[in-house]
A protein has these predicted regions:
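Flexible, glycine/small-residue-enriched loop-and-beta-strand segment within the central core
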Residues: 2-4, 9, 17, 24-119
Length: 119
């Protein structure tokens, strides 16, 4: 079966993802299980899309972006180079907070520019 989206050979898309027609996933990126990515999206190189993330139609995700569980982006969202989402308040390495993940909603047409952190 041929996909109607493009994934570079160095990237991974886990089972259980829904990827829209015309979407492109470039070098060294990882789209984890349960993600939904809309039509005509562009996922740059070295991007991590954690489990169950939702990206609307025509989203542009630039290089080196980390999108963590709980993030939902509307249509036409632009995520600039090296921006990151933080899905817990006050993260610490010695304390597991997986039960404290926060949902983050980014509305239609929003811009998160270069090196922005959204908590």
């Amino acid at each position: 079966m041929q996909n109607d989206y493009f994934v570079h050979e160095s990237s991974y898309v886990d089972e259980g993802c829904v990827i829209g027609k015309g979407t492109k996933i470039w070098h060294f990126s990882h789209v984890m299980s349960g993600c939904q990515i809309g039509e005509d999206c562009n996922i740059g190189q070295n991007v991590v899309v954690s489990p169950s993330v939702v990206l609307g139609r025509n989203c542009k995700v630039q290089n080196n972006v980390s999108i963590y569980t709980g993030v939902r982006c509307g249509d036409d969202v632009f995520l600039g180079p090296s921006m990151v989402f933080t899905n817990v308040i006050n993260p610490r390495s010695a304390v597991s907070r997986k039960d404290e993940y926060k949902d983050t909603l980014i509305g239609r047409g929003a811009l998160a520019n270069t090196s922005v952190e959204i908590a």
